[in-house]
């Protein structure tokens, strides 16, 4: 006895149907969805029978608009990998049915917007962002329509505004009533190279050049305009700083300390070969302190020091042959070494035997005899081998002149 594959009962009818290599009652061969009798053609999935429409509706390609199956006889439209019914392929904003070949914009992979609605929406958003970014400007003027000759007057102002905006980021959350800044623009390395090359060619580009840069870099023209303003302001600040640094370098590095003294001295007063010569040709700014002569605070440099003869009074204060310090400035009442002053003979006199009728001053040479240099033998037979003006013996009583020690 043959049993039906659908109802599992024996088949007693005169006719039967053979479907999927199994016997069926004629009334049992029907669609499992719509229950219609299948006489000519049927579709099966997982042992179930379907009519053509229900099979493609359940297992065929789904419409991206209504999420329903698409029948093979239906007309469809394709956008990328999506398939739509003709009635489902519409603009999400104006619900206009999109035709073949029409430009459209895809949002969230399954939402489509016609070109007119997209451009209108983008222009509105751009105007809002520009209005929020350009605070305090006239809204009737477009930023790209301004004359490039006005850029210089706005360079420092835009730089200050950028600094103020950067410093006020922390207070944005607190000032809820104030307008918030527009979106920050990040310039990539390739875009930055293009802008730097354009700035090197023309620091003040015209609107036509800015439009070309906007097409090349993909940046907004307002962003490019502000970048050029800030870059010009930065270049001016760098030039000012470099000029100030050059002036400071020239002021501090020039040897000016000895110029007024050289101009005031006569040519005959300089004795480059004497033991107490004036170092007018020395170009250094500083002198090293003397080793043992405290009343000469500054000593001559070793390169141009004149070494006098070994004097007896120098044995107690330092090694023989130590040069005396150079006098840096001429003082009133002090004569240059050309007038035959003998410092050893002056120091040999005690304070009470000074030929000068003036009272002894604390800074005079008369009071510095034995306290500074210690005991010394008489200076009767020693002479200074320095120059022609120092050939006289130190035993001669010199003409004393009052002078303060420098």
From Swiss-Prot:
GO biological process terms, semicolon-separated: anatomical structure formation involved in morphogenesis; anatomical structure morphogenesis; anterior/posterior axis specification; anterior/posterior pattern specification; cell-cell signaling; cerebellar Purkinje cell differentiation; cerebellar Purkinje cell-granule cell precursor cell signaling; cerebellum development
Low complexity: bias regions: 137-148
SUPFAM superfamilies: Glucocorticoid receptor-like (DNA-binding domain), Homeodomain-like
A UniProt-annotated Pfam family: Homeodomain
MF annotations from Gene Ontology: DNA-binding transcription factor activity; DNA-binding transcription factor activity, RNA polymerase II-specific; RNA polymerase II transcription regulatory region sequence-specific DNA binding; zinc ion binding
Gene Ontology terms: cellular component: nucleoplasm; nucleus; protein-containing complex
Domain of life, per lineage: Eukaryota
DNA-binding region(s), chain positions: 180-239
LIM zinc-binding domain span: 4-54, 63-117
Subcellular location: Nucleus
Annotated stretches, region: Disordered: 125-187, 296-372
Gene3D superfamilies found in the cross-reference section: Cysteine Rich Protein, Homeodomain-like
Ranges in coiled-coil conformation: none
Main subcellular localisation: nucleus
Designated name of the protein: LIM/homeobox protein Lhx1
Organism field: Gallus gallus
């Amino acid at each position: 006895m043959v049993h039906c594959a659908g109802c599992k009962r024996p088949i007693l009818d005169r006719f039967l149907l053979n479907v999927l290599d199994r016997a069926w009652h004629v009334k049992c061969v029907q669609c499992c969805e719509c229950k219609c009798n299948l006489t000519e053609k049927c579709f099966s999935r997982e042992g179930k029978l379907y009519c053509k429409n229900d099979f493609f509706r359940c297992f065929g390609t789904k419409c991206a608009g209504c999420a329903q199956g698409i029948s093979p006889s239906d007309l469809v439209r394709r956008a990328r990998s999506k398939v739509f019914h003709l009635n489902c392929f519409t603009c999400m904003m104006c619900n206009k049915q999109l035709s073949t070949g029409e430009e459209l914009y895809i949002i969230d992979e399954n939402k489509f917007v016609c070109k007119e609605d997209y451009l209108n929406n983008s222009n509105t958003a751009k105007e809002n962002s520009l209005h929020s970014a350009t605070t305090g400007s006239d809204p009737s003027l477009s930023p790209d329509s301004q004359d490039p000759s006005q850029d210089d007057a706005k360079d420092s102002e835009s730089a200050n505004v950028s600094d103020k905006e950067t410093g006020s980021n922390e207070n944005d959350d607190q000032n809820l009533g104030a307008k918030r800044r527009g979106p920050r623009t990040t310039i990539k390395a390739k875009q930055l190279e293009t802008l730097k090359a354009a700035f090197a060619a023309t620091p003040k580009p015209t609107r036509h050049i800015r439009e070309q840069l906007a097409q090349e870099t993909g940046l907004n023209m307002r962003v490019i305009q502000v970048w050029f303003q800030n870059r010009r302001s930065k270049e001016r600040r760098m030039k000012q700083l470099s000029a100030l640094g050059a002036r400071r370098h020239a002021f501090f590095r020039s040897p000016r300390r000895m110029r007024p003294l050289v101009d005031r001295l006569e040519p005959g007063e300089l004795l480059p070969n004497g033991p107490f010569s004036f170092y007018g040709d020395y170009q250094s700014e500083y002198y090293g302190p003397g080793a043992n002569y405290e009343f000469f605070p500054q000593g001559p440099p070793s390169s141009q020091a004149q070494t006098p003869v070994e004097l007896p009074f120098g044995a107690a204060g330092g090694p023989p042959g130590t040069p005396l310090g150079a006098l840096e400035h001429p003082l009133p009442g002090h004569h240059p070494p050309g007038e035959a002053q003998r410092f050893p003979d002056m120091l040999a006199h005690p304070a009470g035997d000074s030929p000068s009728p003036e009272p002894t001053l604390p800074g005079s040479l008369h009071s510095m005899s034995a306290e500074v240099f210690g005991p010394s033998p008489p200076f009767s037979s020693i002479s200074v081998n320095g120059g022609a003006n120092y050939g006289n013996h130190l035993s001669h009583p010199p003409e004393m002149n009052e002078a303060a020690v420098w």
